[in-house]
Amino acid sequence: MTLKPVLLAFLVASAYAQYGVAGMYENLPLETTTLDGSGDGSGADNGFVSGADAVAIDTDCSTKEDGLYAIGGCSPQFLTCSGGISRIMDCPADLIYDPRIVACEYSYNVPQCGGVPQDVTSTQEAYPSEETTVNPYAPVEEATTTPAEDVTVPEETTTEAYAPVDDYSTTTPAEDVPVPVETTASPYAPIVPYTTGAPAADEPVTRSAVTKSCVGKADGFYSFGECSDHYTACSNGYLIPMQCPARLAFDEARVICDYVMNVPECTNGSGNDEGSADETTPESSGEMPYSNGYGYEETTTVAEDVPSTKDYAEPIAAAYVARYPSEKTTAENVPTTTIGYEPEVVETTAPYVEETTTTVGYKPEVEETTTEAEVPTTTVGYEPEIVETTAPYVEETTTAADVPSTTAVYEPEVVETTTEAEVPTTTTVGYEPEVVETTVPYVEETTTAADVPTTTVGYEPEVEETTTEAEVPTTTVGYESEVVETTAADIPTTTIGYAPIVVESTTAADVPTTTVPAETTTEVPACVEGATAIEPCSQHYKNCVNGQEAIFICENGLFFSPEQARCAPADQIAECHQTTVQYY
């Protein structure tokens, strides 16, 4: 006898600790007839569940269906039955359970309350403005009618926000109330009742006859007919109609949509099978049983006089859809053209044109200049790397012994500047590091008038030659960084750049033309191989390699040593002990 009440109290306390919803267990079954036996509830019961209105509650759910049941006419509590288990629930705040809407409602909207609480003897207002207790879960004293069966449950002390669960002693252990599990969250939150009826029977799904084509087939894709653009996808015995893009047919072997010429079933390449539309069934025609191309029928109605907008003829009311390409008929007096599908190949035939072959022989690039009338013209054959310059009124004369002539080794890019008499010309040649022009005699000698000192500079990069007439001093400055050319006003200057093609220049009429032929000389080694000194204790020295001589400069602070054939400090050179040369 003692174990069952203790177990009941333990279950109540466990459920309270699990859910902890305020007001959930405020008013458990009210079976006592005394005021103290009902407890204070939330501290503001407004006379709803006080000892004055305590009534006997039928909590037996063994004979009830799952659902919600009202406890009294105007009560904030209600009973829930689920699987034969009963639970008493409390409405939030000052709400009353309304069985009409199966939810908690304000008392003035519940017919059983008539606008006032159930206790008609009470004079309290329907909506009190203040509460009477501070602790909403004040402990309730136990009251028993049979002292021998009383079970004393010690009061629990907790630091949590929720007070211990009230214990009630019952005289009938069989009518113990289980622990509630939930309560409504809002005044109008409906509680879905539990039903114990049989589950709703599955309604049979009616499918069209076309779905039977996948019965017994494995999941996959299947052609809907021979040489058809429609095919079906089977999944779990159900058919999904599908269609290839325009002008393509489904190849079941490769499971792709391809041109009809590549599909083995389309033997004639046109996609049309023999036989009429009346003798063709949907399964054998390769088309879906409906004109829309899918496994269902659309209800769209098209008038008979509305022409089809597709590129092939399609009967509107018939179930057969012709394959394409098909025959298309236009208005009367227009011939009908049946076009079978063929690859789009365009063949163009051009008239025969006799092919003419022209063979052009190689001609050297010879530049010919024709002068005015009465001027003899001289054409010079192509000789590479020869520049011919004709000066007016200058006779060809061999330079006398006392006329110095200097000829340098021929190097590319020679620029020649010619000025008239008594005009001093200064030409500054751009500086090139560690390269000095070497003068070699008897190479491509150029002869000028008698008593005219001529300096002919062989071709070398960025070196300019200045030639003046008699009694005109010419100054050639060594390498410097800037090139400055000064020419007096009204004096024509002719600059002839190097070109591999011979250019012939002729003067005006009545002017005799002199052609200087290219003079061929045998090259004589102009230098001794190796490095040699130019002067004692000098930073400059000459170096001859393969007959080509160049002048080099030692690094700063070093001088050329003839004994060592290299640049060395001055204290290692005997010539430097006598005289120290410093160049600026």
Swiss-Prot record:
Glycosylation sites: 50, 268
Keyword Cell division tagged: yes
Keyword annotations: Cell cycle, Cell division, Chitin-binding, Developmental protein, Disulfide bond, Glycoprotein, Proteoglycan, Repeat, Signal
Annotated region described as Disordered, given as residue ranges: 267-295
Alphabetized GO MF terms: chitin binding
Residues covered by the Chitin-binding type-2 domain: 58-115, 211-268, 524-578
Cysteines engaged in disulfide bonds, as pairs: 91-104, 244-257, 554-567
Designated name of the protein: Chondroitin proteoglycan 1
Organism (species): Caenorhabditis elegans
